[in-house]
A protein has these predicted regions:
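Class I S-adenosyl-L-methionine-dependent methyltransferase catalytic core
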Residues: 1-209
Length: 209
């Protein structure tokens, strides 16, 4: 699956899976918001079976976006990939419409207008910056301490086809440092990042058109 990287290991993995899940209310199959824009999606079992150990360094930080209605499934994927959870809401995207109004999203219980990303670790990765924006003020002394907090809460407009704002990539780098890093399920080439997915470059082409 990751043969193209020739055994290279990464200290930061940023992932936005196209989650596939069953909708018990309708009896049908649904996809996450991002999944509607991918050519293919992956079931939880397929995600769990990904050979992440082939690309994860011994000391590695994982940032993974997940579906709010599937927290346990997300935790199962994190565990299967060999990581330990540090924060279910390490990154939070509060979505705005093109008119700068809070997004009135989908949901059967409440209408979601945000997405969250898990932060998890493998080994003992170092924190490059002690000034990553957080909710509240604190003086962390260790990675375990810094990851007890919500690292970054951003309010940004929704982009093309569920594209996550680039500010989150920048926040990841500020946290982990200028380390070897990869984005999984990427649809956009970004300088400094290795990328993997079946639609790499799709968003670059749209913006260039």
């Amino acid at each position: 699956m990751f043969e193209q990287f020739n055994g290279q290991k990464f200290n930061l993995i940023y992932s936005d899976p196209a989650w596939q899940f069953n909708n018990k209310k309708t009896g049908g199959s649904m996809k996450s918001g991002a999944a509607h824009h991918y050519k293919s999606t992956m079931s939880v079992d397929e995600l769990k079976a990904m050979p992440i150990d082939d690309i994860a360094a011994d000391d590695c930080i994982l940032v993974m976006w997940y579906v709010g209605s599937m927290p346990q499934e997300a935790l199962d994927v994190v565990k299967a990939w060999g990581f330990t959870l540090k924060n279910m809401n390490g990154f939070v995207w509060n979505k705005l419409t093109v008119n700068n109004n809070p997004l009135f999203g989908m949901g059967f219980w409440t209408r979601a207008g945000s997405e969250s990303a898990i932060i998890a670790i493998k080994g003992k990765p170092k924190v490059a910056s002690r000034s990553v924006r957080a909710v509240g003020f604190y003086e962390p002394e260790s990675l375990d301490e810094i990851l007890k907090h919500t690292i970054f809460s951003g309010t940004f407009k929704i982009g093309q086809h569920s594209e996550k704002p680039n500010e989150f990539r920048e926040a990841c780098v500020e946290l982990a440092g200028d380390v070897p890093r990869i984005e999984l399920f990427s649809r956009k080439r970004v300088k400094g990042w290795a990328v993997w997915g079946n639609e790499v470059g799709k968003l670059n082409k749209r913006k260039a058109a």
